[in-house]
Amino acid sequence: MQRNSVEGDRFSSMTDEQLVALCHEGEDLIPVIVSRYAYVVKSKAYAMRVDFSEREDMMQEGFLGLLSAVRAFNPQKNVSFSTYANKCIFN
C-alpha cells in the first residue's frame, strides 16, 4: 500500500498523456491512472441510479473501459487522454 503512495507522489506532476506514454513503454502505472479516474467512474455509476449490484457492475465496466482507453490511446489523434478516457468509460 505504501508503494502506491510513493508512486503517486512520484508521478503526481505528470500529465495523463505522459503516464499513458510510459504505460505504452512497459511501465506499470495503471494504479496511478486508475486512482486519478476512480472519481469519474464512480460518479458516472452513481448517476445511473441503479441498485447496488448493478452499480458495482457498472463501475467494473467503467474501469475496464478506462483500461481499454490506456491501451488504445493515440496522442497523434489530437484529443486529450481525459476526453478519450471519458468516452471509453461508459461506452
PLM regions and their residue ranges:
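Alpha-helical promoter-recognition and RNA polymerase-docking modules of transcription initiation factors
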Residues: M1-N91
